[in-house]
Curated annotation (Swiss-Prot):
The keyword Cytoplasm applies. GO terms for biological process: meiotic cell cycle. It holds the Pfam family UPF0300. It is found in: Cytoplasm, Cell cortex. Coiled coil: none annotated. This is Meiotically up-regulated gene 134 protein. The lineage of its organism: Eukaryota, Fungi, Dikarya, Ascomycota, Taphrinomycotina. Keywords: Cytoplasm, Meiosis. GO terms for cellular component: cell cortex. Belongs to the UPF0300 family. It comes from Schizosaccharomyces pombe (strain 972 / ATCC 24843). The gene is mug134.
Amino acid sequence: MNYNANVVKFHSTILHKFALKISKFLILCMRRNKRQLACMKCQCENPMAAITYADIEYPHNTHFLLLDSISWIPCTCKILKLKEFELPDRFDIPNLFYDGWLSYVFHTFSGVYLKIGYEMDESGFCLPDQVYHLIDNHSCIQTAVSHLLRNHQALFKYLCDYLRSGEFPLTVLIHHVMLYQYYPKSLQEALWAAVEHYVNNSGEAYSTVQKLAVQKKIGNIRMYLVNPRDIFALGSTCNCIVVSSSNFQSYVQLRKPLLENNLPYEIDGFDKILQCANSEADIGWIAMIHCIGSNGYAFPIHLYLNMKKNIFLGKLPESTLLLYNSDGAIFKNPPSSKKECDFYNQLLLDLCKCRQFNAEMECNMKKLFNNPTGLHSLPNLPNFSEAGSAKSSNFCSSKDNCLTNRLTLNCLDTPSDENGEDIAIQLIIPAE
């Protein structure tokens, strides 16, 4: 009897341990499926995956205020002895948003969030609301980005050359501005130079204050790509602004209240920038771009510009928080072979777009030079310089089986060496 009892007890113990392990495994799977982890080491969230969040309502305002209307600006202008500005006929405008992208950027103690959806248009198309959590500066992201940059330094150097020279299409600028906060200082400096070129040459009627502000790198870099005429204040609060048009609207909570004592007077030369103001709206704008802080990194700039300029030719961008799904490689430590290949293939396509853009601009300039009657229409011809050289590079340095097919690009889109000869860059197509 004792023997049988011991056997039963032994087997029941084994079954209990087995059931316990199975239950723990299932719970872990459910948690990972729910959180959609970005990094298995630290189990941080994947910011490109929508999360469940307590219901938060969009602000609803029937009227917005021009930046000229901020109450403390007239007093500040008198203290700074600025010239008297011509005031607009009215300070408030009706909310003209009808359909399209509707979003809300807000922050809590746990970070910055983006709530976004697509309001139904005439065709009946709509997208349900989703919430994303922005991971700003996590150690695993820094490690992953360092890994990507270290393996392919020449390609990023070539990208920096294009950005600094102003030889890039808008889609390339948007792509890398949306990765700005994850990049090292050298790439950030190149992006500031590129945005400065955009502000000075985009034809969006940027004021002198805005052009000087981008030189000083004041505020959040994304917000320089927003037409200043689309930014409004809210009469009910000084903690939020809105970017609005007929088919795009985004409420953005500010990191600091939009108050006079939050102007960045500590920045060298800031007083001189204010002296160049042409309107009270300039004062409100520079206060906004400084007070928005890191919340601006969650503003969906690619969706805004697509609605304004149709830069994606009627297509929806791949991702909501970033531009391409391949950018998710920076949230994996270490990135998987396929994701790393996808990331570098997209980087190659960006370089190809820059090369094509440069070639088309040079072709247009040659036509103008060959047609002297058309030269007077160009007040300032841009000085295009030769982009820096780049060596032939494989986009995936790993030796695994993900590299099964290589497509050589021999066209206008390929970089050239010191002798001006095209270099064959290999586009890597990972195995399915």
